[in-house]
Swiss-Prot record:
Official protein name in the record: Protein-glutamine gamma-glutamyltransferase 6
Family: Belongs to the transglutaminase superfamily. Transglutaminase family.
Organism lineage string: Eukaryota, Metazoa, Chordata, Craniata, Vertebrata
InterPro entries: Ig-like_fold (IPR013783), Ig_E-set (IPR014756), Papain-like_cys_pep_sf (IPR038765), Transglutaminase (IPR050779), Transglutaminase-like (IPR002931), Transglutaminase-like_sf (IPR036985), Transglutaminase_animal (IPR023608), Transglutaminase_AS (IPR013808)
GO annotations of cellular component type: cytoplasm
Entries under SUPFAM superfamilies matching the protein: Cysteine proteinases, E set domains, Transglutaminase, two C-terminal domains
Function per UniProt: Catalyzes the cross-linking of proteins and the conjugation of polyamines to proteins.
Native species: Homo sapiens
Amino acid sequence: MAGIRVTKVDWQRSRNGAAHHTQEYPCPELVVRRGQSFSLTLELSRALDCEEILIFTMETGPRASEALHTKAVFQTSELERGEGWTAAREAQMEKTLTVSLASPPSAVIGRYLLSIRLSSHRKHSNRRLGEFVLLFNPWCAEDDVFLASEEERQEYVLSDSGIIFRGVEKHIRAQGWNYGQFEEDILNICLSILDRSPGHQNNPATDVSCRHNPIYVTRVISAMVNSNNDRGVVQGQWQGKYGGGTSPLHWRGSVAILQKWLKGRYKPVKYGQCWVFAGVLCTVLRCLGIATRVVSNFNSAHDTDQNLSVDKYVDSFGRTLEDLTEDSMWNFHVWNESWFARQDLGPSYNGWQVLDATPQEESEGVFRCGPASVTAIREGDVHLAHDGPFVFAEVNADYITWLWHEDESRERVYSNTKKIGRCISTKAVGSDSRVDITDLYKYPEGSRKERQVYSKAVNRLFGVEASGRRIWIRRAGGRCLWRDDLLEPATKPSIAGKFKVLEPPMLGHDLRLALCLANLTSRAQRVRVNLSGATILYTRKPVAEILHESHAVRLGPQEEKRIPITISYSKYKEDLTEDKKILLAAMCLVTKGEKLLVEKDITLEDFITIKVLGPAMVGVAVTVEVTVVNPLIERVKDCALMVEGSGLLQEQLSIDVPTLEPQERASVQFDITPSKSGPRQLQVDLVSPHFPDIKGFVIVHVATAK
């Protein structure tokens, strides 16, 4: 009998794609998930004899070996699935054979080469069948990344767009983001990110063998999304100067960033800030099959010395002293959570894990963060891997402001144990709503349980019991002071103060506010009020001073007074950053030595609306109308709309906007032709050299073609 050979392979991409939830990947090769069988049909040179044997070989990575679990050799069997790779005959018709192949739920993920050996009466035929890609499988109960809820799998694995929350605690704004994990080349780029890592460059065989473990994979990608150590994807920039690159606020999604990294031969893409790093990390992990979401923390601590405190130093006008202040409190910070088991810690710590690709501090010599179990953070188990102290401080640190005197002494003028870690937010499953998940990270502020957890974290970090909220703090110059009573309430204040916004703060308009002071005593008091204001980045780093004035105020018994404040547009327009944020401070000096510091964050408003004029259907053009308003009291030209949306546009659109008169409202129409059904996010930005980008998005519900 003549030898047998394979003449053709049908990878059954449609059938396998539907079964594995991978039909959206546009790759030429098959994409499947581990721990689940997939089928392929072989056309043979003749009918297969019952005594003839099919032996399959799977290989991934360089120097693949069975010892490293990067190679598997197995033959068809009627037995039940074992722990390794298996193959079974599904159907046979003359010269056609359909086989079912299955990987173990702990298989290494990545690109595989599949080969077959047909043995017949001492005759052998070998053939490479081709390559396929194996991903993590949140649908497989035995996979470490298993997620039980189908609604959550749809949101956190398959949704290719989302919302990132930015702003300040009392003014949270939603920004659309195009994850685009199913766009052209994105899967290949995500696999390239793993292959470009230092671990792979140094020892590729060992690195690939570790890719069965989501803990390892997410930690590698957390480092590779930033460029600080490894020519990773995105280069950070927080100074407001973006020459030679793209402003972080100009990005509308991850696809353009990842494609630019590939086309630039892996040169870091300029520039990113926290939400950009988080958006890209979310794309990569969803693409590889790990359920991932973007999380925003408002009043987020950056505790450089891990003493669970943010110490801010100010002068007599309340201005931050940059040379003394090493810690910081960002208006918001954005990171990721991914869902998987912690085999290294135990089942109590399974579930959501914090990952942060923003390069803030080094972890084991590399700029990365996590995975840190959210449960471990809530319970104060900061000693557990990875980077628990840093994440715990981001949501739980104490906040103290010190007045720095000319004689280099300092005086505490403000302290708050509840200021850090507010309104921790993520997008709701299946809707655009904001969900507050603060209770996943910590017990209610001020509760007995919260105090116990804080004390536990201090003990884990410093090996001492905390009798109060605070154990030690860093002095300027690096010396430390042990204090258990540092955050005990100060003496009862004799005055109170707050800023009141008199008119909505609109971009392009003068700002009108008042400082409201109240005498809380039955005696008259004199107060010197030093006012300052500055444009700031979202990290609260000052950019330029726009207000500096002093007032002498006499307050009668129980009297209240207002100090009116006006900041003209001409004062701030040249120095306003794309964050559109201003910080006001009032240092109130009472005659008898008491100090009161009052601060106010202001975010300037803008306007854009987007309407889809009719039903949207795959393959049918539909008109979109965008209405914008020139926020300035001057004529502007050279404006454009930048439009992006996965499944709605093949590439970014740039649409010129006619010259806008002062505060003019104008509408622009354009057509889109959807290529995919379901809810799709269309992002539209008004871009101008005269003012920061004005961003908007709308969800377009696309019907299937009739």
